[in-house]
Structures are given as C-alpha cells and as structure tokens.
Design a protein with these regions (language model features):
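Carbohydrate-associated surface elements
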Residues: 180, 200
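Nucleotide-sugar-dependent
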Residues: 22, 235-238, 284-294, 301-320, ...
Length: 421
C-alpha cells in the first residue's frame, strides 16, 4: 500500500445516486461536510437523473456554490437507466474516465466508493492514478435483490454482481454498517483497515424547536405509531397494516403516521383492506429537515424488514432517528445489529413472529416502555453514543482515512455500543 504524502488529505467520493435524492441529502452530504471540517479536501461525483417533483429543485449553480462553501467540490455525470446492463456499463466507463482525470488533475489521495458500482469505478481507475480506494459496503447486494424478488439466484446479473464483489475486496480499506457484516465478510484478522460505521443521525437536526405536528395531522390526544421509510414487500407493508389493526383493538386512540417517499397507495390499500378508517392514519412525504418534528410528536416507532441473509449487513437509518426522538422501537428480528442493541440497551421490542398474538404482545410491551420514567432520555443517550453523525460517523471515517495515509489518529471514538449478543 502506498502511503499518502504529508499534507491535507484529498478524497474523491463517488456516489451512484443523484445529489437531490433524500438518501444523499441525509446520508452522504452530512458526512462529507464533517470530513471537510476535519481537514479533508473533498470532491463529490454524483450521477444525475430526472428528479421527482418532491425532491429539491434548486438549480445546480446554487447547490454547487453552497457545497463549495462547505469545502466540497461537486462533479456530475448523467445517469443511464435503460437498457439495464448496457446502461451500467456506460456509467462505469464514463465514471472511470472522469475519476482518472479528476484524481490526476487534483492530486487526490483516496477514491471513496459508496457501494459496489462506485467502488468498482474507483478500482478500475486505481492503476492509472495510484490513489488508494475505499469500498464503502452498503449491503450484500446480490443477496438483497434475490430476497426482494428482483433477481433469480444464479441469474446473469446475480453472477456478475458476485464476481464484481470478489474483485472489490482488492480495495485498500473498507466500511461496513454492522458488526455482523464485519464478522461475515472479514472473519479473519484483516491487514487492511476496516471501520464499522452504522447509518447515523445528525444531532443538529434534532436540536431545533419542533412544531406541533399532532394538531396538523389531526392526532391530538392519540397514541401515534410512526413508520418512516420505504414501503413494499421488503418492508412488510401488509404486516404494518396488520400490526396497526391489532394495536387499535388494544388502544382505541391508536393513530398510524407513515412518512415515506414511496407511493402512498402501497400502504393505503392495505389499511383499506383491514378496514381502518381514514381518520385513524396520516400518510405523507416529509422532507428530511421536517422529519424530526414528526418523529418527536410520535409515541411508538416501527421498523419492519423482511428477514433474510442479506439483512445482517443492514443498518436502517430510521433506527437511529427513532432513538434520537426518544421512541421505543418495534422491529422484526435479524436486521443488522438491531437485535443485540434492542435487547441489551432495552430500547424496544423484537417481534417473535408476524402473527396477531406477537403484534399484541409487542404493542403492549412498547406502550409500557414509553411510559417508564426516563425512558425517552435513555433512548436519546443510546442514539448519541452509538449513532451520532459527528462523534461516531465522521470520526470513524477520519480514523479510516488516517489509517490509509499512515497519519496519527487523534480522534477518540466511543466504541461502547451493545451490538453483540
């Protein structure tokens, strides 16, 4: 491994998403701003596509100037979607050429690839640049698509993705989201630096005064059960509606709040199926800056994900955000490190199975937890200790960067999170 010269670290962060996507706004830019403040010069390459109307529509020039003020230089390429495999090849070629040119021109030290395709671009560019490459592993991609029903195990795309993954382990450093992923992917001691960095929350977004959401959604005096995030088969939308139907039989004041960028029809159809009246739920897209107000107005949080092998590498963003809002979390089992954290930190309830009896048991336990003195503060303490964007997320990224560069690491990271059984 070639050591980085003694000067400010320079990184090119490659992200195969649009800057305007909510995921990039909440799970990429805050980390890059933190790394910039820590002394790293940052370039960001995104792949842009046509934006849905509910995403930000501010012109590129405004965003480019804003990011430059944060110490981030923003580069863009066009995202191609069809036909699927040829489009990916075009993006990989275009991305590799752009990365090579940028790294050479700006004397960049580290190419940071977020997920498989971005890391592949970095590794293809490495022989032409001499830069070090980070593979930021966001999950077990091939297995995830098979479990979601999008791919068939053994299909061409599945086999290509598995081959690419093996190639990606030639990277110089790695990020994984969970302890379980680290144990599965790197069972032996690795000579290469690895950091476990879960999806974190930005405490600054939770420090602002929260508006009265209960009145706005017609839920004053109700027990609000909140679900934030994607909908669909992977996220057990049918089971979410079934759970709420059971909760209503126990607490007639129960009210379901769903904040999602998915089609509201997905959950509305399921609520209609169970006979839930419209007065007992609210479904809306909530921009990231307003989400804390909605979560802090709630009482109990739901995190439902279809179990499967790929989920051991998953770190749901909503989990950190729920805890930051002081909420007990009801979750399916087998999702990343959540089982161990919920059990050991006592911040929620794990569903035994997806049955009415299990739903009733979990709701009663969560309802009792939220009423315990000091429970909300205990949840917030866990959130700050284990998922703080600055003291955990950014600090661990900088630890990885310094390990790659051979620089001393002055950053103290709190490792005391109960993520093992």
């Amino acid at each position: 491994m070639t050591a980085v010269v003694e000067r400010e670290l320079r990184t090119l962060y490659v992200c195969y998403f649009s800057l305007y996507e909510p995921l990039v706004q909440t799970q990429v830019l805050p980390y890059l701003r933190g790394m910039s403040r820590a002394g790293t010069k940052v370039w960001l390459l995104t792949f842009e596509r046509t934006m849905p109307e509910h995403w930000t529509t501010e012109p590129e020039e405004i965003w480019r100037a804003r990011l430059r003020q944060d110490g981030i230089e923003w580069l863009t390429l066009r995202y191609h979607s069809r036909p699927s495999l040829p489009a990916k090849i075009v993006d990989i070629v275009n991305g590799t050429v752009r990365v090579i040119r940028t790294v050479r021109r700006e004397r960049i030290d580290i190419i940071h690839g977020r997920s498989h395709l971005a890391a592949l671009i970095g590794l293809l560019a490495r022989p032409f640049t001499g830069a070090l490459v980070i593979f930021d592993i966001r999950g077990l991609l091939a297995e995830y698509y098979v479990e979601a029903g999008n791919w068939r195990a053994g299909s061409l795309l599945y086999r290509i993705t598995k081959m690419v993954k093996n190639f990606l382990f030639r990277a110089d450093g790695f990020v994984v989201l969970t302890d379980r992923a680290r144990a599965e992917m790197f069972p032996a001691v690795s000579e290469k630096p690895i950091q476990i960095i879960p999806t974190c929350f930005d405490p600054e977004r939770w420090s602002a005064p929260q508006e009265d959401i209960r009145e706005a959604i017609g839920a004053r005096g109700r027990t609000i059960i909140v679900y934030a995030g994607s909908l669909g088969i992977t996220y057990l939308t049918k089971e979410l509606a079934d759970f709420f139907a059971v909760a209503r039989t126990i607490d007639e004041t129960a009210f379901l709040l769903v904040t999602t960028h998915s089609s509201p029809r997905l959950i509305r159809e399921q609520l209609d199926r169970t006979g839930i009246p419209a007065a007992d739920f609210h479904i809306a897209y909530v921009p990231p800056e307003k989400l804390p107000a909605y979560l802090c107005a709630s009482d109990i949080a739901m995190s439902l994900v279809k179990p499967g092998y790929s989920k051991l590498a998953m770190s749901p963003t909503k989990f950190a955000e729920y805890l930051a809002s002081g909420l007990p979390v009801i979750s399916t089992r087998g999702i990343g490190d959540m089982d161990a954290m919920i059990d050991n930190e006592r911040v929620g309830v794990l569903l035994d199975d997806l049955t009415a009896d299990s739903y009733a048991k979990a709701f009663r336990k969560a309802d009792a937890l939220r009423k315990q003195p000091g429970f909300a503060d205990a949840c917030r303490e866990v959130a700050h200790r284990c998922f703080d964007l600055h003291s955990v997320g950014t600090a661990r990224y900088m630890r990885l960067y310094r390990a790659l560069s051979g620089s001393p690491d002055p950053v103290a990271v709190d490792e005391k999170c109960a993520t093992t059984p």
